[in-house]
């Protein structure tokens, strides 16, 4: 299996993504998704569209700092490409261990210590299809944001406009600004 760090294409991000109270409560959770495709996806094209996608989500290619925020430093997201040429799509669908066998690797402890990105991707090319797996830190995105990210990736890959993610954290109160009664 070959793993490459994918970084934001174009302008380099900066700043930090601060964890809200709710984000902190979700730091021990991982959101996982897996998609099956007929036909073999082009790994190079998927990486290229993913790099463009990260421009909309720069915090996902950063690293946690002091457990309070993600530094948007463009360290990159691990993107693994694997081959399973003897496995057919119809076999993969029936495998009880498919999520483990084809799932992206995500080290939750490494993420919380700033050694892993908040997101990881694995693309496994089968004999007649492809399995795409994403694992992400729930503290950096909720379910809606996770699935919107995947939808936006598909849109970018097909050359369509994306659904602009909401990233204005000023709307959320930070723990330091809350009074004891709140």
PLM region descriptions:
Residues 1-182:
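Non-catalytic N-terminal regions of enzymes
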């Amino acid at each position: 299996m070959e793993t490459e760090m994918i970084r934001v294409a174009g302008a380099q991000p900066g700043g930090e993504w601060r964890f809200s109270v709710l984000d902190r409560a979700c730091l021990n959770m991982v959101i996982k998704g897996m998609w099956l495709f007929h036909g073999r996806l082009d790994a190079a094209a998927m990486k290229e569209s993913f790099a463009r996608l990260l421009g909309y989500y720069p915090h996902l290619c950063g690293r946690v700092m002091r457990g309070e925020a993600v530094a948007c430093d463009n360290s990159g997201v691990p993107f693994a490409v694997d081959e399973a040429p003897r496995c057919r799509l119809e076999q993969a669908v029936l495998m009880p261990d498919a999520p483990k066998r084809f799932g992206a690797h995500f080290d939750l402890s490494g993420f919380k210590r700033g050694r892993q990105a908040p997101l990881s991707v694995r693309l496994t090319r089968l004999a007649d299809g492809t399995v795409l797996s994403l694992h992400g830190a729930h503290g950096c995105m909720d379910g809606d944001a996770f699935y919107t990210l995947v939808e936006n990736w598909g849109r970018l890959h097909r050359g369509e406009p994306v659904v602009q993610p909401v990233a204005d954290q000023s709307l959320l109160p930070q723990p330091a600004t809350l009074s004891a009664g709140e």
